[in-house]
UniProtKB/Swiss-Prot annotation:
It comes from Salmonella paratyphi B (strain ATCC BAA-1250 / SPB7). DNA-dependent RNA polymerase catalyzes the transcription of DNA into RNA using the four ribonucleoside triphosphates as substrates. CDD domains: RNAP_beta'_C (cd02655), RNAP_beta'_N (cd01609). This is DNA-directed RNA polymerase subunit beta'. The gene is rpoC. The keyword Ribonucleoprotein does not apply. GO terms for molecular function: DNA binding; DNA-directed RNA polymerase activity; magnesium ion binding; zinc ion binding.
Length: 1407
């Protein structure tokens, strides 16, 4: 018995490993894996079904077909273990060795491995520095290659055609060596001296100046170095021995009817063996060269097809015309090994069923059908039955369960008690898609789900199905209970707000019971407390909505956290008093003393969680739900057709609109407006009419007139069912009610453009045929869009998870003082997101000072929770520098301080939390709610685009930043800087509004002046860009020659004449080199200098500029010298929604990006070329000027002689994130991406915390390009992990050496995922072949740092509870201990079980 136990133990031993290395296999290595050579293409004997000897399924090579039984049947049973049968040569052992024993094929002629040949860039080609075409011609026997030139004039690696070879043979005889086929390439690779080659290349690299050559050399050096360091030999890329996969991994299964189902690999192997054997025979027969050559080529093709079918030429197809699945196809793609079997597995102990609602369940419970539970918990039941002695054997227990005896149900109840199960609903878009519940046994066959968790699962009860999983081990149960229980997941990890929020019926019920009604039954009563309120309501003495006075006792926490009672008489309603009974102690009465809509309820639960913690919140949420359901049922709110009240005014509004449209149609026909203008105006008219109708309708629905106690009429909020549903947030919205009772309004065509005839009817009136037809358009597009959206959103999530999966919190504090400056998000006159929302849950990077003093308000490294944020608001702090993941200094992972609060728990984040995946899920999960389409701006929107003034909304003082200005003759400020911002500051110093002020704007109010709300503070002409003089004097034209550089135009309407500068394309040859300009001179004719510089005031005019002044006129500073017409951008489509988010994360360059100044200096224009102009920026310090060619059609924002700072916009357009990173740094690009992504989500009303986007940005910035190597081993221009450069530089500086300088790179998420250090993770993401080829050549080690790699190799992930396990393992490895077997300590009940087990197994240790 003992040795059997020992033997069983030995069978299940696992290897401890820290990393996985991939490399090229040498022929000897392949032979060492092999258990014998496969010589014949036969598989199994079709009569005996026994494997053929030396065939592809040979039992002698690969092992026995039956457990412990040789093929001929001489040796059977366990006792012959390890015997090799002398008759059939089969070792007696387990069958499962047929899954691991490999064979090999000795190839008669070497063949190239197609991956290293054809996977671009071709490794063989790069190593030999030969073009791929040439190598292929040699390999497939079309030309010769010279291997050794000898004393002849032939170069090594020179390609010779058949004729050239024969000529050379005649000329030189055997002085030279030339071959064809893989042997030739093998010989070339073998004879390479890698180190020598490296030296030569490095010397060449230092001498060369051409950029392309440098790139090529760097690539080759990297490859050669990889070969030298990894110990791979180049000739191993040519196969001489082919490994054969174990037969159970390419099975051959007999089907009924004498046919076989087989894996495609067997066919591919058969071809290789057939051709190989034929080639051997031909070589033995010394057949003519041409025949042998053909056979060798066929062998090469067969091996290619086996390794990667279809990569070269046409794919080899099977009998049914479909391409065969080769080894490469087995591992790549969604159905490949990585994604199908390693990252996702099917699990036992699971079941699935339809879900129904369980409104009586507690939040931590779910209803599990008895039948399902019996099946899922079978092993536990068997164990219990045996333990109780109710069944003698497992078999007996099985019978009892199958018969469903009464005692089995009692046992099931015990087993299930406090044994959580996991419920999962596909698609699992975020971590709340799997939660743990305690099962409650129910009759029936559907799983019952608690209504409050539906929001997290995005579940409804229209036929959704869910899966149940049983956590088996104690650890798993503990984790399910402590971390995954639905009661522990009240807050959403995406934004830290409650996700267990009542919706629909519950909201309606609570809203109904907290509404008040004038003159309801029982109004004016004074009640002793909520209990009495409930009694009189039940007795029918008072209505739920009656306004009454009630004695209420509130509890409030004092400084020590003790509850203090306050009792007072409150004006409230009966319903609110009843609701107060379930509100936990510690919350103020004001929280329920209002009509509770969905928002208010959410806020109530949030407050409860923040003040009282988890347990009261859970109980409260449950109670709210029961109460809500109860009162919704009592309310009897239902929808009837009479609830949809159509406003009387509707008819006249529509006829007015029709009249206006007719008028515009007339104007169009008489030619006063263009077709485009007419269309836009018509749409505007209808949109306005629609708004008026819906306003009339809502006013009508919102209020009703009632008679109060004194007999006067009074308006009160309506009790119309439809209105109540929308107002409470239970279901429906104003827009939907508008379609029911107002008018349906304008519809869009499938391409997004708006149809100009609206649907004037509503659903209550009914649609006519035409209106119905127009409606179907939009409806179908909606469905098609949704389908596309889901797929796109899923793919975005996958890319995000892949890029961020290895980011885990690994230390407490990295000690950095860096951070990002947080300011409120203000667009125009609205605060889109106040500062408190942005800094809540972040850690301060430096002390926050009280504004205007040196007092420290919040010290550095403080986690800002709600109370701190209140303090910041009270002191009207405007900007806070907070720690951010992007600037975190931790090498691998991030530190807790830089991340801040764990949003789903409300305290600082724990070590080991997988923040990368959480971030990816939080951004990806709402992806399906984003729109797919690009918006066409039309109608109202396009008119708003051409703004011409700034009007402030609130009163306050004006603050201008980045401003240069001059005062014009009327004493007003004129802005002469490019990126001026105007902020409105209230009396507390908080920014309320923020606007961009364009160049040439005239300010009505100056910096620091007070303004009233609604005042206009700046004006400008939106259609032209002025040239403004900064000095006063007289104008002197230079190079302004009529007919050559300028032309005179007269306006027909006004009769005024103006000069227009000709574009260089329109000028005559004489005028090409002239630079028209306006010079400012004083009365004596001397140049006037620009103030603060020694440059004369001279304004060069670009083409198309209009000058309305004459030569010699007097002007004063701030006057407009010329105007440059702005071509309005037309209606540019804004990419919105999901595509925009994808573009940002993929860091795609926009079509016509803004041109930014690369250096600071003075702008001038050099010699123009055809279609381009040369922009020159000369730095003030006299270093080299920077030149850039800019297409002529780009509109420039700068004039000659203007000073720009680095990163200033020279030509407008969407900014490219790479430029922002290069010119303005990491923080600027972070701010840009975060704000742009947030804009898209904010538009859809989705809240995501900034830090999730920052996490992704950190991962996009994880590579750096080396600029100068210093004393490091990096190559110039090489792209390396940022963390590696940091570590290397730290070591170099510690030894007093020079570190490498580098610039950060911004990679798109797909690129970043593929560029990770871990090849396993990259290979399982995309482009598997390329990743594996690259890794194998370089002999890469995968340190298994990320989550994905560890899932693939089947270990605990280094995050969450697995983080501690890995830390512990590392510590043990460092100390050199053996891993201790984990001591199982459960409750005392299982201690006796442990004793029993130890007694059984302990005997084997003490020999």
């Amino acid at each position: 018995m003992k040795d059997l136990l020992k033997f069983l133990k030995a069978q299940t031993k696992t290897e401890e490993f820290d990393a996985i290395k991939i490399a090229l296999a040498s022929p000897d290595m392949i032979r060492s894996w092999s258990f014998g050579e496969v010589k014949k293409p036969e598989t199994i004997n079709y009569r005996t079904f026994k494997p053929e000897r030396d065939g592809l399924f040979c039992a002698r090579i690969f092992g026995p077909v039956k457990d412990y039984e040789c093929l001929c049947g001489k040796y059977k049973r366990l006792k012959h273990r390890g015997v090799i049968c002398e008759k059939c040569g089969v070792e007696v052992t387990q069958t499962k060795v047929r899954r691991e024993r490999m064979g090999h094929i000795e190839l008669a002629s070497p063949t190239a491995h197609i991956w290293f040949l054809k996977s671009l860039p071709s490794r063989i080609g790069l190593l030999l520095d030969m073009p791929l075409r040439d190598i292929e011609r040699v390999l497939y026997f079309e030309s010769y290659v010279v291997i050794e030139g000898g004393m002849t004039n032939l170069e090594r690696q020179q390609i010779l055609t058949e004729e050239q070879y024969l000529d050379a043979l005649e000329e030189f005889g055997d002085e030279f060596d030339a071959k064809m086929g893989a042997e030739a390439i093998q010989a070339l690779l073998k004879s390479m001296d890698l180190e020598q080659e490296c030296e030569t290349l490095r010397e060449e690299l230092n001498e060369t100046n051409s950029e392309t050559k440098r790139k090529k050399l760097t690539k080759r050096i990297k490859l050669l170095e990889a070969f030298v360091q990894s110990g791979n030999k180049p000739e191993w890329m040519i196969l001489t021995v082919l490994p054969v996969l174990p037969p159970d991994l390419r099975p051959l299964v007999p089907l009924d009817g004498g046919r076989f189902a087989t894996s495609d690999l067997n066919d591919l192997y058969r071809r290789v063996i057939n051709r190989n054997n034929r080639l051997k025979r031909l070589l033995d027969l010394a057949a003519p060269d041409i025949i042998v050559r053909n056979e060798k080529r066929m062998l090469q093709e067969a091996v290619d097809a086996l390794l990667d079918n279809g990569r070269r030429g046409r794919a080899i197809t099977g009998s049914n015309k479909r391409p065969l699945k080769s080894l490469a196809d087995m591992i790549k793609g969604k159905q490949g090994r990585f994604r199908q079997n390693l990252l996702g597995k099917r699990v036992d102990y699971s079941g699935r069923s339809v879900i129904t609602v369980g409104p009586y369940l507690r939040l931590h419970q779910c209803g599990l059908p008895k039948k399902m539970a019996l099946e899922l918990f079978k092993p536990f039941i068997y164990g219990k039955l045996e333990l109780r002695g109710l069944a003698t054997t497992i078999k007996a227990a099985k019978k009892m369960v199958e018969r469903e005896e009464a005692v089995v149900w009692d046992i099931l109840d015990e087993v299930i008690r406090e044994h959580p199960v996991l419920l999962n609903r596909a698609p699992t878009l975020h971590r709340l898609g799997i939660q743990a519940f305690e099962p409650v046994l129910i009759e029936g066959k559907a799983i019952q789900l608690h209504p409050l968790v539906c929001a997290a699962y995005n579940a409804d009860f229209d036929g959704d199905q869910m899966a149940v999983h049983v956590p088996l081990t104690l650890e798993a149960q503990l984790e399910a209970r402590a971390l995954m229980m639905s009661t522990n997941n009240i807050l959403s990890p995406a934004n830290g707000e409650p996700i267990i929020v009542p919706s629909q019926d519950v909201v309606l019920g609570l809203y109904y019971m907290t509404r008040d009604c004038v003159n309801a039954k029982g109004e004016g009563m004074v009640l002793t407390g909520p209990k009495e309120a409930e009694r009189i309501y039940r007795a029918g003495l008072a209505s739920l909505h009656a306004r009454v006075k009630v004695r209420i006792t509130e509890y409030e926490k004092d400084e020590n956290g003790e509850l203090v009672a306050h009792t007072s008489l409150k004006d409230t309603t009966v319903g609110r008093a009843i609701l107060w009974m379930i509100v936990p102690k510690g919350l103020p009465f004001s929280i329920v003393n209002q009509a509770l809509g969905k928002k208010a309820i959410s806020k109530m639960l949030n407050t409860c969680y923040r003040i009282l913690g988890l347990k009261p919140t859970v109980i409260f949420a449950d109670q709210t739900m029961y109460t809500g359901f109860a009162y919704a049922a009592r309310s009897g709110a239902s929808v009837g057709i009479d609830d949809m009240v159509i406003p009387e005014k509707k008819h006249e509004i529509i006829s007015e609109a029709e009249a206006e449209v007719a008028e515009i149609q007339e104007q169009f026909q008489s030619g006063l407006v263009t077709a485009g203008e007419r269309y836009n105006k018509v749409i505007d008219i209808w949109a306005a009419a629609n708004d008026r109708v819906s306003k009339a309708m809502m006013d009508n629905l919102q209020t009703e007139t009632v008679v109060n106690r004194d007999g006067q009429e009074e308006q009160q909020v309506s009790f119309n069912s439809i209105y109540m549903m929308a107002d409470s947030g239970a279901r429906g919205s104003a827009a939907q009610i508008r379609q029911l009772a107002g008018m349906r309004g304008l519809m869009a065509k499938p391409d997004g453009s708006i149809i100009e005839t609206p649907i004037t009817a509503n659903f209550r009136e009914g649609l006519n045929v035409l209106q119905y037809f127009i409606s179907t358009h939009g409806a179908r597009k909606g469905l098609a869009d949704t389908a596309l959206k889901t797929a796109n959103s899923g793919y975005l999530t996958r890319r995000l998870v892949d890029v961020a999966q290895d980011l885990v919190v690994t230390e407490d504090d990295c000690g950095t003082h860096e951070g990002i400056l947080m300011t409120p998000v203000i667009e125009g006159g609205d605060v889109k997101e106040p500062l408190r929302d942005r800094v809540l849950g972040r850690v301060t990077a430096e002390d926050v000072l009280k504004p205007g003093t040196a007092d420290i308000l919040v010290p550095r490294n403080t986690l800002l929770h709600e109370q701190w944020c209140d303090l910041l608001e009270a002191n009207s702090v405007d900007a806070v520098k907070v720690r951010s993941v992007v600037s975190c200094d931790t090498d691998f992972g991030v530190c807790a301080h830089c991340y801040g609060r764990d949003l789903a728990r409300g305290h600082i984040i724990n070590k080991g939390e997988a923040i990368g995946v959480i971030a990816a899920q939080s951004i990806g999960e709402p992806g399906t709610q984003l729109t797919m389409r690009t918006f066409h701006i039309g109608g109202a929107a396009s008119r708003a685009a051409a703004e011409s003034s700034i009007q402030v909304k609130n009163k306050g003082s004006i603050k201008l930043s980045n401003v240069k200005s001059v005062v014009n003759s009327s004493g007003k400020l004129v802005i002469t800087s490019r990126n001026t911002e105007l902020k409105l500051i209230d009396e507390f110093g908080r920014t309320k509004e923020s606007y961009k002020v364009p160049y040439g704007a005239v300010m009505a109010k100056g910096d620091g002046e007070q303004v009233a709300g609604g005042e206009t503070v700046a004006n400008w002409d939106p259609h032209t860009m002025p040239v403004i003089t900064e000095v006063s004097g007289f104008i002197r034209f230079t190079d302004m020659i009529d007919g050559q550089t300028i032309t005179r135009q007269t306006d027909e309407l006004t009769g005024l004449s103006s000069l227009v500068v000709l574009d260089s394309a329109e000028r005559t040859t004489g005028g090409k080199d002239l630079r028209p300009a306006l010079k400012i001179v004083d009365a004596q004719g001397n140049d006037v200098l620009i103030p603060g510089t020694d440059m004369p005031a001279q304004y060069f005019l670009p083409g198309k500029a209009i000058v309305q002044l004459e030569d010699g006129v007097q002007i004063s500073s701030g006057d407009t010298l010329a105007r440059i017409p702005q071509e309005s951008g037309g209606t540019k489509d804004i990419t919105g929604g999901l595509p925009r988010v994808a573009d940002l994360f993929e860091a795609r360059r926009p079509k016509e990006p803004a041109i930014l100044a690369e250096i600071a200096g003075i702008v001038s224009f050099g010699k123009e070329t055809k279609g381009k102009r040369r922009l020159v920026i000369t730095p003030v310090d006299g270093s080299d000027p920077y030149e850039e060619m800019i297409p002529k059609w780009r509109q420039l924002n700068v004039f000659e002689g203007e000073r720009v700072e680095r990163g200033d916009v020279i030509s407008d357009g969407p900014e490219a994130p790479h430029d922002i990173l290069r010119l303005r740094g990491v923080h600027a690009v972070t701010r840009y991406i975060v704000n742009e992504v947030q804009d898209v989500y904010r538009l859809q009303g989705v809240k995501i915390n900034d830090k999730h986007i920052e996490v992704i940005v950190r991962q996009m910035l994880r590579k750096a390009t080396i600029e100068s190597a210093g004393s490091s081993d990096f190559l110039e221009g090489e792209q390396v992990e940022y963390s590696r450069v940091k570590i290397a530089n730290r070591e170099l500086e510690a030894n007093g050496k020079v570190g490498a300088t580098f610039s950060r790179d911004l990679l798109g998420i797909t690129k970043a995922s593929l560029a990770t250090e871990s090849f396993i993770s990259a290979a399982s993401f995309q482009e598997t072949t390329r990743v594996l080829t690259e890794a194998a050549v370089a002999g890469k080690r995968d340190e298994l740092r990320g989550l994905k790699e560890n899932v693939i190799v089947g270990r605990l992930i280094p995050a969450g509870t697995g983080y501690a396990y890995h830390q512990d393992r590392m510590r043990r490895r460092a100390a050199g201990e053996q891993p201790a077997t984990p001591q199982v300590t459960a409750e005392d009940a299982s201690a006796s079980l442990a004793e029993l087990l130890n007694a059984g197994l302990g005997g084997s240790d003490n020999e």
